[in-house]
Amino acid sequence: MEYQNTDHTFAVCAYKESPYLESCIKSLVNQKVKSNIIVCTSTPCEVIENMAKKYDIPYYVREGKSDICDDWNFSVACTKTNYVTVAHQDDVYNEHYVEELLKHIPDEKMSIFIADYLPLKGGKAGKRDI
């Protein structure tokens, strides 16, 4: 079976007025291979709602106390695809992320896809801090 970009969703978990949210969303919108994107929050505010509207992204609000475990599970439950990347509001993805992910989905041994990272400091990629 060949997997398509429509088999995957980025579920962005957003909290309050994050200054990084738009950078995260732009990195998802600018993927070379397009994918579904949703924004989820347990701390609704105009900043998050307006950002979702600006990029025409479905927006979901979880009721109850903000809790990262429950929030991430909620974001996965809001998707309609078999493959989900939970993206935190301060994550920025390489433009080839979805392209590379789709290459590895057919591997039956793969149950989780982990990508490398570089921390951004002052808008520039820095050295790994762990």
Language-model regions: role of each:
Residues 1-27:
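N-proximal low-complexity "stem/linker" segments adjacent to membrane-targeting elements
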Residues 84:
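Short aromatic/hydrophobic "clamp" motif used to bind/position activated sugar donors
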